[in-house]
């Protein structure tokens, strides 16, 4: 039996471990254990259901056993293959650093080594003629810093090979004798996220596998394959992002793009007019505006500013009032009378600007009735821009012969702006006068009519039926032209009819004879 002094106690040992034993027949046997392949890394496999996805210790530990007979190991005879006994090696796991025991006894730790901790000896010729213990299926449950401890056990078959201390016992012991122990170098057990991966199988593992031992051989480096795969995926994502950044849109037909823009727009009935013509272009209307009824005042703009005002931004509610650049709706208006017409003041009108996509110029257009009163004194932007259109008839209406029924013409301010793209004549804007024998009323001011409402929209209620917001004193009442008999007669006379805005028009009837 091996003496206790010969049992190795150094844990950090990479060198072979030897023991000496004397048998009953005075044979001197030498045993030598060498860890040919040290474990380097492992992945924690966990416990319970996680145990099914475990990774073995990499590389698999390989321990070599050699037995010699003689006075010394160097001078002894190799009898590893001739010695009649059975050997097996048992592996156990321990911490790489010894932990001092506490005063109180702690709870027993569950086993953290799983797999096949026992290996029988395999007689191989390579790399040398000896016995080898291979552990290809050892796994650790928890991460940490560990080392493996291998214990050699022998089952003797011949009585002459028993220890000398057991000479008095004539029968063989059916048990196994512990011979020696050897420990590996420390290795790390990583978690699944921190595990660097398995390495390629070592030449020793391949050589052992070639001789029939059950060792899993990896021909490629899984760690490098994983890194390359992740890098390739990242490169592909970067390439895709670069392509998305550098992709140029396909060229499309400008006509189809314009058609799509018109179809997506909700202003097909209201188009923004073109830019104004140069100042040198002759205007179609006299800038003084003498062919239209306009009660003068710096707070009222010329009626020919409608085309220009459609391109100006709406006024700010809190901003200063600028009569030169803003259109003012008819405000603070008293009675309205039809304007007079002067054909001598009308100039030739240039040809209207044609829009490539506008086909509404040929349709009829009915001018709306202007509002009589305004319910507030603030100016509001128009909800729809106005555009000139071809009137229903270009012939002037029949005017009454009584000059007393027509108010004198008042000149508008000289700074009035007339749009250059207007195709209307002054005669087209005139309204038939109202023949009445009532005395003329003195009015303080009367604004210009509101802009024409484009085809496809309706007049607002406040443009026709509006109340005055002036202060009423001395039992005064609102003067409504629809109901006031002083302003206009209550019922039409002759061939006249009353419109919704309070104006009277002549009706022509065909005479049939029987």
Swiss-Prot record:
Description of the deletion phenotype: Reduces by 80% cephalosporin C production and leads to an altered hyphal morphology.
Matches recorded under InterPro entries: Velvet (IPR021740), Velvet_dom (IPR037525), Velvet_dom_sf (IPR038491)
Domain (Velvet): residue spans on this chain: 26-218
Gene Ontology process terms (BP): sporulation resulting in formation of a cellular spore
Region (PEST) location: 411-448
Domain comment, as recorded: The C-terminal PEST domain is a region rich in proline, glutamic acid, serine and threonine residues that is required for the light-dependent regulation of development and secondary metabolism.
UniProt-recorded name of the protein: Developmental and secondary metabolism regulator veA
Organism the protein comes from: Hapsidospora chrysogenum (strain ATCC 11550 / CBS 779.69 / DSM 880 / IAM 14645 / JCM 23072 / IMI 49137) (Acremonium chrysogenum)
């Amino acid at each position: 039996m091996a003496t206790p002094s010969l049992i190795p106690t150094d844990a950090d040992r990479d060198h072979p471990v030897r023991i000496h034993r004397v048998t009953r027949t005075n044979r001197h046997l030498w045993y030598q254990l060498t860890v040919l392949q040290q474990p380097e890394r492992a992945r924690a496999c966990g416990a319970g259901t996680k145990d099914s996805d475990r990774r073995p210790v990499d590389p698999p530990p390989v321990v070599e056993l050699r037995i010699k007979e003689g006075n010394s190991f160097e001078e002894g005879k190799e009898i590893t293959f001739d010695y009649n006994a059975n050997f097996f090696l048992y592996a156990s796991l321990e911490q790489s650093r010894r932990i001092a025991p506490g005063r109180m006894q702690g709870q027993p730790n569950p086993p953290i080594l799983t797999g096949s901790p026992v290996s029988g000896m395999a007689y191989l010729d390579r790399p040398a003629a000896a016995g080898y213990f291979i552990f290809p299926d050892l796994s650790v449950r928890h991460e940490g810093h560990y080392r493996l401890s291998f214990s050699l056990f022998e089952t003797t078959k011949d009585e002459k090979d028993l220890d000398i201390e057991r000479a008095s016992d004539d029968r063989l012991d059916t048990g196994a004798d512990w011979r020696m122990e050897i420990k590996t170098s420390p290795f790390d057990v990583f978690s699944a996220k921190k595990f660097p991966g398995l390495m390629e199988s070592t030449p020793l593992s391949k050589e052992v596998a070639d001789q029939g031992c059950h060792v899993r051989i990896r021909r490629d480096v899984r760690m490098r394959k994983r890194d390359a795969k992740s890098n390739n995926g990242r490169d592909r994502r970067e390439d895709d992002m670069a392509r998305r950044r550098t992709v140029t849109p396909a060229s499309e037909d400008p006509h189809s793009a314009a058609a799509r823009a018109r179809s997506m727009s909700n202003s097909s009935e209201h188009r923004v007019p073109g830019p104004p013509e140069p100042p040198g272009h002759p205007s179609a209307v006299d800038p003084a505006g003498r062919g239209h009824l306009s009660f003068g005042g710096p707070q009222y703009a010329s009626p020919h500013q409608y085309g220009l005002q459609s391109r100006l931004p709406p006024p700010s509610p809190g901003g200063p009032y600028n009569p030169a650049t803003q259109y003012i709706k008819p405000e603070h208006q008293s009675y309205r009378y039809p304007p007079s017409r002067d054909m001598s003041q009308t100039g030739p009108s240039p040809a209207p600007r044609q829009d490539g996509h506008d086909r509404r110029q040929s349709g009829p257009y009915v001018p709306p009735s202007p509002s009589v009163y305004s319910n507030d004194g603030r100016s509001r932007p128009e909800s729809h821009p106005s555009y000139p259109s071809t009137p229903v008839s270009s012939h002037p209406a029949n005017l009454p012969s009584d000059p007393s029924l027509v108010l004198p013409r008042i000149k508008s301010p000289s700074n009035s702006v007339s749009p250059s793209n207007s195709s209307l004549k002054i005669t087209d804007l005139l309204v038939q006068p109202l023949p009445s024998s009532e005395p003329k009323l003195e009015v303080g001011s009367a604004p210009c009519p509101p802009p024409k409402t484009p085809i496809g929209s309706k007049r607002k209620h406040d443009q026709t039926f509006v109340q005055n917001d002036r202060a009423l004193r001395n039992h005064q009442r609102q003067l409504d032209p629809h109901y006031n008999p002083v302003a206009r007669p209550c019922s039409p006379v002759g061939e006249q009819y009353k419109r919704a805005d309070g104006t009277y028009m002549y009706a022509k009837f065909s005479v049939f004879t029987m």
